[in-house]
Amino acid sequence: MPLPQTGAPGPEVKSPREPRKSQTLPVTTWKSNSMKEQSVHHGGSLRPSLGMLKQTLFRTSLRTSTHKPKEDPGLFRRSSRFLFRSLRRAIDEGLTAGHPQGPAVPEKPSKVTDGVSRQAATGTEAEDLEPQAESKSVADLITERQLVKAFEQLRYLETQLVADKTSRTFTQDPTAYARRAMDLCLHYDGMAAEIGAIVREALSSEGVDRDALAELAQVVHLEEEAHQTSQAEGDFLSTPRHWRMHWEDAVRLSAQESVQQAGAKVIPGAAEGSSDLAQLLAELGGVVRHDLQKVRLEMQPAYEATDFPVWETYLRAFHSAVAQRLQELARDARGCEQLYVLLDWAANVYGSPDFLGAPDLALPTEPLPPLLEPALWARLESDYTSFLETKITSCFDSILQLEQNRWEADEDREVLQGLYHAPLSIDVHMLVAEHVKAAGAISAELEATTLQICARALCLFVPRFEKAFLASKAVSEWYLGAYINACVELRTSLLARFPGTIKELEKPLVAATNSFQKHLLQIVQQDMQPLFKVLYTKSWLTQDTLRPLMDKVVDFAHHLEHVTPPLAQETLQEVHRFVVREYLGQVLRPHERFSGQDRLKGSNKMNLDAQAISNTFQGLGSEAKWLDQAILSVAEILGETYKDDIRRHLETLIRSYPDIRRDHILAILALRRLGRRRNQNLLQHTQDLLRAAHETRLPSHHVLFEEIEVPTSVDVLITCI
């Protein structure tokens, strides 16, 4: 749109206030100050217009932006917006002053590139520029980063231009005001761009130009004092330039550039492994640490003469940049390992008091916001636990496969600290402890969740392992003892390390322990069972048939020496009870019945066997002394010559073993071969004793006769009759 022209065609109209002198910017070679006004050929006349000025401002700003890369493009847009508002206002003032719009006046275009507005437009004489010509131009001062001197000159020119505008010097030629105002605006923008360049170079270069930083801080302070209040709407002269905000923006941009360049060659999402992401985060931490140390130790002292919050501003800028980078990495994180590396770095590396390498440089927790938003943190933890559940299940599968490989390879038996040892307990304990400890390093909530995941997986693994082992060909005293030890160790170690948190593990581990112990007993029982058949026979009276049986017991006890003591003692007592029970069962179910001298010999033989059994098990460490009286009591009844004392022996037997039944008494009396009347009296007497014994028997009382089956024979029936 063409600019309104004043006056009729003819000579250029002079300013009505010619004595007022004005000064323009000197000739300069600075790029942002070089701007050639476009000539618009239309009908043989040159018409400066708003469109021409917009194009000129755009090209000049573009050249400046290419000279100073990565500066805020909004800076020039804001300045141009103020400029054209002011230009409109100047035009309106010219119209209201009584200068109607008329035909265009041919005017020789002014060259803004030389920094000097033509004197015909303002009435300024050439000698007024001599003080400026003797010194450096504003552009040169900016280029040389003499920002204070450059600002003082710009401030002087700005004050003069405001005075000229107030005195309506530009009433008849508002474009002259626009040219000078545009030149001022571009130089102010150039200073702002130079401030951004100084900030960027301070962080990216190896050294620190403290003089430039001090100059920057001083010129920002001077600008804030000079431009304290905003002007009327549409007037951009003498308005605050907000260079402090521009400095803060430059700090943020430089921090973002530094953080984004860290680990740029690493592609963490290329695979599910954690090594690439860990390398990237290590590089990121190193960059942040180096830059913040540089800020604190080298850059902050340069600002010490001003009130610039250097450390706080850079700290917030880097914190925000790191948070943004982590959010980007979180979107691409894959698998359990990468998620954990990300969470661990945020919680333990970046949040560590010695992250910056010195206690006095520790990152404060306040007033910085969380590095990761709570919602994002919760999502990462949820994703991590989902992957973790699958991973832990897979780890238990691998442990089972390793044990199966050992069974097939029949590896050498291992004894650790005197006990049979299988790697099972160590593998499981390390698996649980490692993941729980790693999760605890991130948060207490994640630790509790991980512990529950491990407990559930272990509860499912133990029965699977038990079933797989018992179905294999590796079942033996050594493996059974080793796995009993493993279950006991897991119970004690896990429950001791994580008390009250994984009680559900108690049930499957106890069940597996009992199962392995049961199969261990079955092995020795099956091995000894045939040796009981020769007891209470004719050959038994004259031969030492008990020794092979005791040899089996001693051999088995050697295995129990390598089983954890509580279970070893319990198993040994079970073997002791098994021997006494099977011995009595063989006596009460005899293949042959003795009378006379053979019965007495049998009684003596039973006494000797009872003593040998008791001595053997006591020598092995059995604490089941309550079993010693069983065989002796039956032997005394069979060998008692004074029949009235049989009643006393029966009373002792019933009191010692309250689980004895009436059919057991009948079987014993049948072996003794007493008369009918005496048998009836003894049965009548023992009936009351048996009833009282059953009534007073405790649930925890030992069991012996209850497990001995006595078939009804002719002799027993005769005894009953």
UniProtKB/Swiss-Prot annotation:
Keywords: Phosphoprotein. GO terms for cellular component: exocyst. Residues 1-52, 94-135 are annotated as: Disordered. Residues 22-37 have a biased composition (Polar residues). Pfam families: Sec6. It comes from the Eukaryota. One of its GO terms (biological process) is exocytosis. Belongs to the SEC6 family. This is Exocyst complex component 3-like protein 4. It comes from Mus musculus (Mouse).
